[in-house]
Amino acid sequence: MLKVESISKDYREFKLREISFDVREGEHFIILGPSGSGKTVLLEIIAGIISPDRGRILLRGEDITGLPPEKRNFSYIPQNYALFPHMTVFDNIAFGLKLRKIPRKEVARKVREVAESLGIDHLLHRKPRTLSGGEQQRVAIARALVVKPELLLMDEPFANLDVQTKSKLIREMKRWRKEFGFTAIHVTHSFEEALSLGDRVGIMLRGRLVQVGDVRDVFSKPKSEEVARFLGFENIIEGVANGRILKVGDLRIELPREVWGKVRVGIRPEDITIFMEGVKTSARNVFKARVEGIEDLGALVKLTLNLGGIILRAFITRSSLIELGIREGEEVYASFKASAIHVFP
């Protein structure tokens, strides 16, 4: 449907370099990256707000690079929602329809239909300043969807919401997508949004799109250490592999496949299980470790473990920490399955 070809742009402090990807019909495509990676600049180029220095954008095979925003039939939701403060919710949602010269009765019908679907039909007489953050976001989404855009562009759509409201809107976004059948490009730094909503994801680091693929594949099989570290592979180990065994100091770690020579592997902290004593487990990698640090992260706790000079980090729940009575300086057992190990190419 949409094809982005070799887009480059120097814009203020941002630099985009040779960005290329495609978006399929009906897909929810996530652009995931840290703050300052150029995600918003890329989205605004796709929207037609900013012109690229090089490259082009194709919609169904037609070059739309020079087409102004109002000619693209895209809906763009900026991070601050950009609702008109002097207008009611009804008039905000109706704005795009009125620009398209839609008859008044049809405007009213379409606005009420989308408002009912998004659960804001009781707010149509209100002004944006009287709404909660979640309600404002629903209004912004309604305004975007009511015109039936070919492409929905969303810039950090849930960034300004509290955790509970965000989780609810993510669940509802799935339902709205089924109901309205839209195609979306969604910019975010949130792993939760990417994993919950995305079909495919593009990882953006330092102005470059460094990996594109199915969301689950990218999260489980990052192509580089840079991508892996961004995606939460805190444990990256170097050793010498002999078939399915990796030698790291005095440790012998079973690998998911045969590898030979010097390699580097990654293990997510959440894939490491902690026991206070040796137990039977399907995991082939079980090691004694000393707890060198305990970091409180709220619902989770991060443990820093020393496995014979090899430092690993593991997540456990707060309740597990209390139940097991884990303290700094104590010895525990750390286990992880061979299938949880990612071998870098």
UniProtKB/Swiss-Prot annotation:
Recorded catalytic activity of this chain's protein: tungstate(in) + ATP + H2O = tungstate(out) + ADP + phosphate + H(+)
UniProt xrefs under InterPro entries: AAA+_ATPase (IPR003593), ABC_SmlMolc_Importer (IPR050093), ABC_transporter-like_ATP-bd (IPR003439), ABC_transporter-like_CS (IPR017871), Mo/tungstate-bd_C_term_dom (IPR008995), Molybdate/tungstate_ABC-ATPase (IPR053428), Mop_domain (IPR004606), P-loop_NTPase (IPR027417)
GO MF, any single term: ATP hydrolysis activity
EC number assigned by the record: 7.3.2.6
Superkingdom of the organism of origin: Archaea
UniProt cross-references to CDD domains, sorted A to Z: ABC_ModC_like
Topology of the protein relative to the lipid bilayer: Peripheral membrane protein
Broad class of where this protein is predominantly found: membrane
Gene Ontology BP term (one): molybdate ion transport
GO cellular component: plasma membrane
Residue ranges of every copy of the Mop domain listed in the record: 280-345
Binding positions (ATP): 33-40
ABC transporter domain boundaries: 2-231
Entry keyword Transport: yes
UniProt KW keywords: ATP-binding, Cell membrane, Membrane, Molybdenum, Nucleotide-binding, Translocase, Transport
Keyword Cytoplasm belongs to the record: no
Subcellular location: Cell membrane
Summary of subunit composition and partner proteins: The complex is composed of two ATP-binding proteins (WtpC), two transmembrane proteins (WtpB) and a solute-binding protein (WtpA).
Function per UniProt: Part of the ABC transporter complex WtpABC involved in molybdate/tungstate import. Responsible for energy coupling to the transport system.
Family: Belongs to the ABC transporter superfamily. Sulfate/tungstate importer (TC 3.A.1.6) family.
Name the record gives this protein: Molybdate/tungstate import ATP-binding protein WtpC
Species this protein is from: Pyrococcus horikoshii (strain ATCC 700860 / DSM 12428 / JCM 9974 / NBRC 100139 / OT-3)
